[in-house]
Amino acid sequence: MGRENILKYQLEHDHESDLVTEKDQSLLLDNNNNLNGMNNTIKTHPVRVSSGNHNNFPFTLSSESTLQDFLNNNKFFVDSIKHNHGNQIFDLNGQGQSPHTLWIGCSDSRAGDQCLATLPGEIFVHRNIANIVNANDISSQGVIQFAIDVLKVKKIIVCGHTDCGGIWASLSKKKIGGVLDLWLNPVRHIRAANLKLLEEYNQDPKLKAKKLAELNVISSVTALKRHPSASVALKKNEIEVWGMLYDVATGYLSQVEIPQDEFEDLFHVHDEHDEEEYNPH
């Protein structure tokens, strides 16, 4: 398959490469001028406008990028979606959101929900350092309630990742300073509760960090399932909750097996009439 045919294939299909350049387009169009009746079938791929080479290649922007560079990237984003879907996606988004999934992940720039290859309007997102979910964090608790009770999501993913800075910090005794030491306390508690298990990985720090990341996902999923809204929805089989780990070196997700929570029923608070109110008198 020649270069011209590869480029033509990319431009005619919905999963075309974002790496098509102006030179590639010119080559493709010149080639198709020699083909009978083919010009009208080609959808011109949006071209990314660049201010020139920057020191962050192959990424699209850098610390030296200007405001106009960011706006150009936004235009490319819009043009790419319209190229594949017309105005349908933005028309639907203009009418409101109805996401099917809540994604709870780490703030790490490498580990966002982009790995699901979804479109705007599909995923409701909450991210923080080390993808921590606990009952003391009003932000995550509010997001979970809103996602389940208002948006009616059907899937919830809690996703950790390899090479997580919050995990590495929790494996160290070095003080970070500011609010971060307090924020990472839940991960340190997980480390303390699994100290013997983690010591088995002392000869391989990367595997040790990966194991703690998995344990942290388990802890966050367990905390999420104990959330009042999640507990009720799970009892009614209205949602599924999955733990995931994203590998920043490969781009692939893997499932983290979540053990059964023996205290799950203790956190199932509800308004059902058959439940007697506790009264010691």
Curated annotation (Swiss-Prot):
Entries under InterPro entries matching the protein: Carbonic_anhydrase, Carbonic_anhydrase_CS, Carbonic_anhydrase_sf
Sorted UniProt keywords: Cytoplasm, Lyase, Metal-binding, Mitochondrion, Nucleus, Virulence, Zinc
Induction: Strongly expressed when cells are grown in ambient air but non-detectable when cultured in air enriched with CO(2). Up-regulated by MNL1, HAP43, RCA1, and during early stages of biofilm development.
Cofactor remark: Binds 1 zinc ion per subunit.
Activation and inhibition: Amines and amino acids act as activators of catalytic activity, whereas natural product-based phenols, dithiocarbamates, aliphatic and aromatic carboxylates, boronic acids, and sulfonamides act as inhibitors of enzymatic activity. Also inhibited by anions such as cyanide and carbonate, and to a lesser extent by sulfate, phenylboronic, and phenyl arsonic acid.
Pfam assignment, any one: Pro_CA
Catalyzed reactions: hydrogencarbonate + H(+) = CO2 + H2O
Signal peptide start and end residues: none
Subcellular location: Cytoplasm; Nucleus; Mitochondrion intermembrane space
SMART domains named in the record: Pro_CA
Function comment: Catalyzes the reversible hydration of CO(2) to H(2)CO(3). The main role may be to provide inorganic carbon for the bicarbonate-dependent carboxylation reactions catalyzed by pyruvate carboxylase, acetyl-CoA carboxylase and carbamoyl-phosphate synthetase. Involved in protection against oxidative damage. Acts as a CO(2) chemosensor and induces CO(2)-mediated filamentation. Essential for pathological growth in niches where sufficient CO(2) is not supplied by the host. Necessary for white-to-opaque switching at low CO(2) concentrations.
Homology family: Belongs to the beta-class carbonic anhydrase family.
Name of the protein this chain belongs to: Carbonic anhydrase
Organism: Candida albicans (strain SC5314 / ATCC MYA-2876)
Origin organism lineage: Eukaryota, Fungi, Dikarya, Ascomycota, Saccharomycotina
Gene name per UniProt: NCE103
